[in-house]
Curated annotation (Swiss-Prot):
Part of the 50S ribosomal subunit. Transmembrane segments: none annotated. GO terms for cellular component: ribonucleoprotein complex; ribosome. It comes from Ehrlichia canis (strain Jake). One of two assembly initiator proteins, it binds directly to the 5'-end of the 23S rRNA, where it nucleates assembly of the 50S subunit. Keywords: Ribonucleoprotein, Ribosomal protein, RNA-binding, rRNA-binding. One of its GO terms (molecular function) is rRNA binding. The gene is rplX. Pfam families: KOW (PF00467), ribosomal_L24 (PF17136). Belongs to the universal ribosomal protein uL24 family. This is Large ribosomal subunit protein uL24. GO terms for biological process: translation.
Amino acid sequence: MGMKIVVGDDVVVISGKDKGKMGKVIKVLRKKHFGKDVSFAIVSGVNICKKSVKATQKSDGGIINIAKPINLSNIALFDSTLGIRTRVGYKFIDEKKVRFMKSSGKVIE
């Protein structure tokens, strides 16, 4: 099965504490949980948490901001041409399966 959201996509958060925020997908995480596929994405500037880091010989301690994963069901692809969120579809062009935006029909590279 193809992934609807991949690294480098511009996405918008559709539910949760960061609803309405936009960012770029940094990493996509997939795993199985009780036989079901559970997918998460790390998005820049979204779901930021503070973490206390203990001092070591190589680095100083302190509080740092890290981006936590967000469930793929809580984000949607952002169509920059229309300025709205959109769904992802698949179609074949020259016997090659490609993703496209359902709102504008634009092919996603």
